[in-house]
C-alpha cells in the first residue's frame, strides 16, 4: 500500500480506499485476513488510532468482519464485494 497521503482528505478515508482497491483488484480476496492494526500503522507510518477508525468504517459498511481472537477479515459475502466493485467502477 502507498503512504503518500493528500492533506485535503482524512487519512483514514484514504487508507480505507486503498484497502477497498486491494479487495476489488483481488489482492485481498473474500475471507482473507486484513493486516493487524499495528502492522498496517507501522507499514503506512500512521497512528494506530487512524487504522482502527479505518477498520471500524469498513466493518460498518459490511466490507470487513472481526473474528474474536483471530483478527479482521474481508467479508465472504459475494454480494457486498460485487456492490463494492460496482461502486468503485463508477468512481473511475
Where does each model-flagged region fall?
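Short, low-complexity, polar/charged sequence segments that are solvent-exposed and flexible
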Residues: 53-56, 85-86, 92
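Short secondary-structure transition/capping segments
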Residues: 44, 78-79
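Short, Lys/Arg-rich nucleic-acid/phosphate-binding segment
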Residues: 34, 63-74, 78
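Short glycine/serine/threonine-biased micro-segments
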Residues: 24, 29, 60, 67-69
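Extreme N-terminal segment that seeds HTH/winged-HTH DNA-binding domains in transcriptional regulators
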Residues: 1-33, 39, 83-90
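N-terminal helix-turn-helix
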Residues: 34-65
Amino acid at each position: 500500500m502507498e503512504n503518500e497521503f493528500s492533506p485535503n482528505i482524512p487519512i483514514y478515508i484514504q487508507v480505507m480506499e486503498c484497502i477497498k482497491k486491494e479487495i476489488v483488484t483481488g489482492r485481498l480476496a473474500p475471507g482473507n485476513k486484513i493486516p493487524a492494526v499495528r502492522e498496517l500503522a507501522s507499514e503506512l507510518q500512521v497512528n494506530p488510532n487512524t487504522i482502527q477508525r479505518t477498520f471500524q468504517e469498513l466493518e460498518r459498511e459490511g466490507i470487513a468482519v472481526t473474528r474474536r481472537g483471530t483478527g479482521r477479515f474481508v467479508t465472504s459475502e459475494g454480494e457486498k464485494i460485487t456492490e463494492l466493485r460496482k461502486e468503485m467502477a463508477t468512481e473511475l
